[in-house]
């Protein structure tokens, strides 16, 4: 059995996208890990899965998996690619889609130039909504001072469908994204782990950002990370509310807009890279892995 897939990216954040509306595949953790291996499989930051809707008021179900095989709640760059993919596959001809994710329903609107606007919902800042358990931390206004390997690190938290910690830095190029990101990602204060953003405010409508993604590592871009960083920046008064804010990442720039009390709106480009097929049984057999139960 061969399964068709499409490789896409949003600002360098790369995805393998599979249509499970017209195809059948039992996704296991082992298979996701193999597919995500850039040497033995296809390779991606996240696997995006299009499934039939589970409820009548949405168009599709949208599932996201990291390379370690874990299913996650949300992916903003992936959402943009999801919208372009279902149109290219002729699964829908709607310009505006409602899709269900593990964290709730989001709306996707595609323009004639291939850019997609995503209604990411309202940001959440309460520790219980992240989730974040700051028992051993010091809080000054909205900032938390978290002990990381004996060193206090000032950070802010937000949930954009998935958990984010954001650190304001003077220069993102000097930020210790790899080691500090890894340490905070798995810190006991974040029971479900956390994505870690390093934000440099250039002016009130421009930030530079690097993100260490939970279960992946640093990526070229992170849509939910950009939304979290801009929402925090607006909440703290560093950025203009209700205006287009340019979030500049390694892979390129996207536009984030947030008026407190309303949804965060994210707009950015997508790109198709190639299409292909793979054999699930062949991959598993090559790796010497016996079939496992579904995720």
Swiss-Prot record:
It is found in: Cytoplasm. SUPFAM superfamilies: Diaminopimelate epimerase-like. GO terms for biological process: lysine biosynthetic process via diaminopimelate. It catalyses: (2S,6S)-2,6-diaminopimelate = meso-2,6-diaminopimelate. Pathway: Amino-acid biosynthesis; L-lysine biosynthesis via DAP pathway; DL-2,6-diaminopimelate from LL-2,6-diaminopimelate: step 1/1. GO terms for cellular component: cytosol. Coiled coil: none annotated. It is an enzyme of class 5 (isomerase). The record marks 274 as: Important for dimerization. Substrate binds at residues 13, 46, 66, 76-77, 162, 195, 213-214, 223-224. The keyword Ribosomal protein does not apply. Keywords: Amino-acid biosynthesis, Cytoplasm, Isomerase, Lysine biosynthesis. GO terms for molecular function: diaminopimelate epimerase activity. PANTHER family: DIAMINOPIMELATE EPIMERASE (PTHR31689:SF0), DIAMINOPIMELATE EPIMERASE, CHLOROPLASTIC (PTHR31689). Homodimer. Catalyzes the stereoinversion of LL-2,6-diaminopimelate (L,L-DAP) to meso-diaminopimelate (meso-DAP), a precursor of L-lysine and an essential component of the bacterial peptidoglycan. Belongs to the diaminopimelate epimerase family. This is Diaminopimelate epimerase. It comes from Psychrobacter arcticus (strain DSM 17307 / VKM B-2377 / 273-4). The gene is dapF.
């Amino acid at each position: 059995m061969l399964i068709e897939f499409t490789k896409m990216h949003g600002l360098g954040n790369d995805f393998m996208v599979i249509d499970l509306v017209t195809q059948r595949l039992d996704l296991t953790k082992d298979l996701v890990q193999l597919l995500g291996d850039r040497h033995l499989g296809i390779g991606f930051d996240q696997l995006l899965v299009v499934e039939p809707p589970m409820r009548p008021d949405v168009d599709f179900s949208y599932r996201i998996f990291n390379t370690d095989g874990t299913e996650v709640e949300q992916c903003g760059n992936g959402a943009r690619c999801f919208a372009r993919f279902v149109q290219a596959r002729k699964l829908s001809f709607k310009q505006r889609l409602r899709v269900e994710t593990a964290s709730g329903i989001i709306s996707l609107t595609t323009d004639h130039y291939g850019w997609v606007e995503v209604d990411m919902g309202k940001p959440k800042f309460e520790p219980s909504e992240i989730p974040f358990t700051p028992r051993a931390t010091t809080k000054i206004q909205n900032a938390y001072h978290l002990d990381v390997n004996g060193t206090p690190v000032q950070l802010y938290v937000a949930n954009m469908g998935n958990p984010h910690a954001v650190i304001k830095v003077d220069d993102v190029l000097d930020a210790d994204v790899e080691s500090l990101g890894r340490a905070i990602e798995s810190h006991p204060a974040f029971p479900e782990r956390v994505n870690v953003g390093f934000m440099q405010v250039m002016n009130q409508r421009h930030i530079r950002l690097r993100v260490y993604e939970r279960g992946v590592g640093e990526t070229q871009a992170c849509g939910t990370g950009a939304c979290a960083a801009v929402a925090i920046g607006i909440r703290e008064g560093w950025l203009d509310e209700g205006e287009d804010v340019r979030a500049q990442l390694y892979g390129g720039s996207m536009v984030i807009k947030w008026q407190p009390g309303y949804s965060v709106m994210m707009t950015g480009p997508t790109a198709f890279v190639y299409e292909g097929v793979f054999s699930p049984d062949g991959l598993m057999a090559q790796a010497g892995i016996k079939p496992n139960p579904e995720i």
